[in-house]
Amino acid sequence: ATAIGGTMAYQAVPRQAQAGKKVREWQQSIKKGLDWIQKTQSSLGHWTAGNYPTAMTALGGTALICSGSTTTQGPYAKAIRQSVNYLTSKSRANGLIGNPLTDNRYTYGHGFSMLFLSQVLGEEEDVERREELIEVLTKAVDFSAKAQTASGGWGYVSAKDGNNFDEGSTTITQVQGLRGCRNAGIPVPGEVIEKAKNYIYKCKNSDGGISYSSRNRGSSRPAITAAALATLYNAGVYDDKHVPDMLKYTKKNLHGITTGARSFGHWHYTYLYYSQVVYRQGEKEWAPFRDKLYNKIVGEQ
């Protein structure tokens, strides 16, 4: 009886009040997450999570800058500055952002760093800092272009270092990073993006999903398909003949957000990208999906 009464009382609460409570819970969860990221940053300005400091620092910085803070304003300004300082210090003469001697998958960190630093550049007002970022990103774009394989993808390392091996997840980091640079005013060769788009298409299976690699074809991967579709959207591709098939595949495999979805692995990676895909479909699809996804994430914090 108490449960029934509680349910009825809850249903009697106006929808607006319920929505307001829900949004407050999300905001509180986001703040707790951002505070945790800031608190766990090292004195050198990086994060590691046990490994891959360049990639983890770029991702941590991206989360902080998404809060609205910049290098000079907001509660996370200091942490963002330290992240930028760390990543720019890792820029090498050949343009790579990272350390190939300690990171055997440096392409991830390079791509995530291009994405993060290009967002910082878009908000940066300090003239000297802007000049430094432009130099670092211009070199980074050049490195990425030269690291692309003959097939149009990227591997865990450059084409030269990796004997022309490529695969989907690293390719996606490069395309998003390059797109971020282009949006920030850094010149990006159009042919590099075109080759990358065609690479994604070559990895597409008949069910609409994307396989691991163009050379090592296999079953479709929900995570890579979601990331590839988000990347195509970021590259300005919405109506290509391949996009509807990929969208249908991701909706079938990912839209339910069930616990069983974890069977394909990399759950958080998957929904980082699939949420971008759904957001592009408009409020009617995004709102109910967002509610379910946010509530699940908050419940696991």
Regions found by a protein language model. Name each.
Residues 38-41:
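Large, well-folded core regions of big proteins
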Residues 1-32, 46-79, 92-194, 202-293:
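An alpha-helical repeat/solenoid feature that recognizes helix-turn-helix modules
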Residues 300-301:
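Short, intrinsically disordered, charge-balanced linker/junction segments flanking boundaries
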